[in-house]
């Protein structure tokens, strides 16, 4: 059995810090940089665009193998239940062999009395601006494992295709494939509560996956959007203030979109600008979405765009629980142990409240550990 979740920080890109999950020592926040519009975003992101259009990702986080025999997860939760330790098993399952996509499935052991087949299922999409990281990348493997242990739930982390090798809508197409996979997986245990969740750009993928689920007739209990990554041609106040942002400086943010969007598309494309995206989605279709938990932070550059999405969902009649005033910056849960614990507790609380009777059963089982 693997003792999981070691520290990694191999790039200037601050997404790579993941020690927050189990290390009692606080992961240091990235130092403030004096950046300008003339900064080299390729150097900042530690990437190189090759002549054939592929990308060399020179600062990638370590890729972790799955742990079918289990890894020991020690979680310090912000909830009243206090610390918990669980073994979480993980396996890679094919999604589409032709596309090279897969799902890494995390399942916690020892929850309740043989009820693992009825645990809530969370379909999870990782962050990285559509360009960086995999489901196996250490920070996001760790995030999924801790969520599986903390909620507790089965967490299916989607290894979707990355840009620029596979520009949008490739990741959205992979999300639709993942929804079809969930329908098949959930069919084996009728009544299993299903949730869709994404962090950062993964939140934008999760939103489209939830629409696909509604179109496919898959019942969802909830949708969790953590700091959704959006932009647009005309700068918002938050974006104008983010030129020297410690995590997502404006030039690096612009480059991520340039690499992710279809050729010749600008940031007002529907894949990027929430106003353009929402213009193409009817209120009747939005109304089919399940209850939503939307998380944001006061210093997150896309926060103004996130509020646009929240307003549109509420106007359509969607049950939205918006917590947009969290302290700190983009992806802060990857740096501060207390923020990680708070984030995990928020997700766990939302899942328990919307999972129905089974959510109460799981909560009681966790309290006995």
Region roles according to the model:
Residues 2-3, 40:
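Context-dependent free N-terminus signature
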Residues 32-369:
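Alpha/beta-hydrolase superfamily serine-hydrolase fold, recognizing
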Residues 20, 26:
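Cationic, low-complexity basic patches in intrinsically disordered or flexible, solvent-exposed regions
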Residues 10-17:
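Cleavable N-terminal signal peptides of Sec/SRP-targeted secreted and luminal proteins
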């Amino acid at each position: 059995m693997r003792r999981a979740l070691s520290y990694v920080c191999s790039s200037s890109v601050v997404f790579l810090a993941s020690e927050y999950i189990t290390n009692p020592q606080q992961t240091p926040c990235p130092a403030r940089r004096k950046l300008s519009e003339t900064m080299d975003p390729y150097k900042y992101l530690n990437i190189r665009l090759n002549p054939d259009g592929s990308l060399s990702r020179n600062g990638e986080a370590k890729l972790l193998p799955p742990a079918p025999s289990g890894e020991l997860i020690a979680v310090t939760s912000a909830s009243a239940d206090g610390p918990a330790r669980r073994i979480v098993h993980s396996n890679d399952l094919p999604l589409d062999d032709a596309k090279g996509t897969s799902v890494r499935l995390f399942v916690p052991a020892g929850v309740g009395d043989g009820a693992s087949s009825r645990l809530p299922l969370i379909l999870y999409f990782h962050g990285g601006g559509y360009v960086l990281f995999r489901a196996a990348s250490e920070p996001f493997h760790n995030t999924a494992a801790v969520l599986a242990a903390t909620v507790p739930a089965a967490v299916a982390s989607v290894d979707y295709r990355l840009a620029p090798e596979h520009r949008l809508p490739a990741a959205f197409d992979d999300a639709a494939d993942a929804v079809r996979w969930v329908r098949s997986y959930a069919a084996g245990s009728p009544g299993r509560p299903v949730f869709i969740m994404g962090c950062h750009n993964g939140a934008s993928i999760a939103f489209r996956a939830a629409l696909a689920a509604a179109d496919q007739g898959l019942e969802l209990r909830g949708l969790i959007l953590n700091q959704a990554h959006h932009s647009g041609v005309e700068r918002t106040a938050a974006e104008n203030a983010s030129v020297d942002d410690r995590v997502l400086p404006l030039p690096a943010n612009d480059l991520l979109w340039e690499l992710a969007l279809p050729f010749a598309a600008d940031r007002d494309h529907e894949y990027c600008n929430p106003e353009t995206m929402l213009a193409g989605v009817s209120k009747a279709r939005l109304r089919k979405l399940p209850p939503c938990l939307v998380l944001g932070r006061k210093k997150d550059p896309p926060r103004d765009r996130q509020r646009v999405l929240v307003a549109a969902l509420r106007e359509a009649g969607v049950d939205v629980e918006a917590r947009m005033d969290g302290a700190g910056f983009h992806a802060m849960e990857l740096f501060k142990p207390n923020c990680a614990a708070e984030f995990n507790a928020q997700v766990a609380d939302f899942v328990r409240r919307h999972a129905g009777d089974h959510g109460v059963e799981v909560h009681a089982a966790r309290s006995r550990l």
